[in-house]
Amino acid sequence: MIAGQPIFILKEGTKRESGKDAMKENIEAAIAISNSVRSSLGPRGMDKMLVDSLGDIVITNDGVTILKEMDVEHPAAKMMVEVSKTQDSFVGDGTTTAVIIAGGLLQQAQGLINQNVHPTVISEGYRMASEEAKRVIDEISTKIGADEKALLLKMAQTSLNSKSASVAKDKLAEISYEAVKSVAELRDGKYYVDFDNIQVVKKQGGAIDDTQLINGIIVDKEKVHPGMPDVVKDAKIALLDAPLEIKKPEFDTNLRIEDPSMIQKFLAQEENMLREMVDKIKSVGANVVITQKGIDDMAQHYLSRAGIYAVRRVKKSDMDKLAKATGASIVSTIDEISSSDLGTAERVEQVKVGEDYMTFVTGCKNPKAVSILVRGETEHVVDEMERSITDSLHVVASALEDGAYAAGGGATAAEIAFRLRSYAQKIGGRQQLAIEKFADAIEEIPRALAENAGLDPIDILLKLRAEHAKGNKTYGINVFTGEIEDMVKNGVIEPIRVGKQAIESATEAAIMILRIDDVIATKSSSSSSNPPKSGSSSESSED
């Protein structure tokens, strides 16, 4: 303020909050996001119905899907949405867990701030606790080999237990395991899984049990000509990034016809060029042609006469998967194709799925890509099935890549909380308070599991703490019986990556929000188009 006059540095209409008010608003917004998904955690969690502005409905209990579909405006709330997206990107599962932990950390931090503990001190304590928690997960984890199918299946089933797809969890877990094993690559003694090699195709109709794994690729296209064979055995597949049609010139052209016979010669030449293309494909031994481009009607006729199965306008991503599955090379020029460019498959056939026809390329001898055909009675069921299978695939892949697992059912969270309280006693200072609050926040996971199962969370937490104090580190909540049991014996296990990434993402988000003490929100562009009236006070300044 100069000579009693305030200095305005922000534009008119700009909203600003600072200090504890800004921090409180950010924390409350983040906690609101956490609470919105809390009731969807675990096998007894509830589903959410999300309706967009067009009236389209999504029914799911998948954390990241719920938050993606929500129209979130508050910046702190958007940061919580990013937590779930990060968890989904790196792990594929545990999105709800990550958001609940982040909300718990912020709720506990609010109490410390009210006791005049500085946010920087809280952040330091949280970071120390996060590192210790991840160390504890590594310490209590159990190694698993790629050949331990039973354990890998249990992990997939644990993931599916909390989904609508749990009714067919045994079959879907088997499909997830086989799909991941088919595309996993062993390099330097470690497995790597590229999810670009796993194609998930959903098709409404049929039952959930009709979902199947295809050792090859599903192309959502039918053959281009009815005269072509429906099935080709011992297929030799040509993949083309070139059209089987006469290329139109890039510039406008006019033909001057002086003699009617010239038209016939012109058409005959076009026909001859198309015949030569088909003859070239036939000469290298191909009996299946799949192209990203178009196929001329005349070329379709010649392909049909040659007994060649053809599909056109296939997506680039599907072409890449076909190349990996069949061993074919994608050829850009038909003149350059050779027999060495062809891929192989035991069978290529047109199959009716629901109301549509699709092309199945199956029986690839050493597939580097596989497909999962997801079926379900309604569109909503199929969509949720796709999300469930995707999570299950990521769980199996994470376990295979990391080679370790930990107990589920809140057991790992309870053990972390128990050990963090002991760890806090060794630290001292105000960071000790933050570490203890971190332990309380981690216990939000078993608390939420108990609440969603209709159990008394206080009784459950007391029993859980008592078991872990006895050294029963794998004891968690059986949400179906309400008892505290050994989760490993019950087959409720999860990859260590799920818990470690959830803690890391939640901690970073909580610290980022705690370090904000000033929120400046500019007015919307619509309001900025209306200039202030003459003589009105302005909060803007010239640069």
From Swiss-Prot:
Protein name as it appears in the record: Thermosome subunit beta
PROSITE patterns according to UniProt: TCP1_1, TCP1_2, TCP1_3
Transmembrane segments: none
One Gene Ontology term of the molecular function aspect: ATP hydrolysis activity
Role according to the record: Molecular chaperone; binds unfolded polypeptides in vitro, and has a weak ATPase activity.
NCBIfam families: thermosome_alpha (NF041082), thermosome_arch (TIGR02339), thermosome_beta (NF041083)
Entry comment on modification after translation: The N-terminus is blocked.
Protein family per UniProt: Belongs to the TCP-1 chaperonin family.
Disordered as annotated region, ranges: 522-543
Pfam families xref list: Cpn60_TCP1 (PF00118)
Biased composition (Low complexity): 523-543
Keywords from the named record: ATP-binding, Chaperone, Nucleotide-binding
Subunit structure: Forms a Heterooligomeric complex of two stacked eight-membered rings.
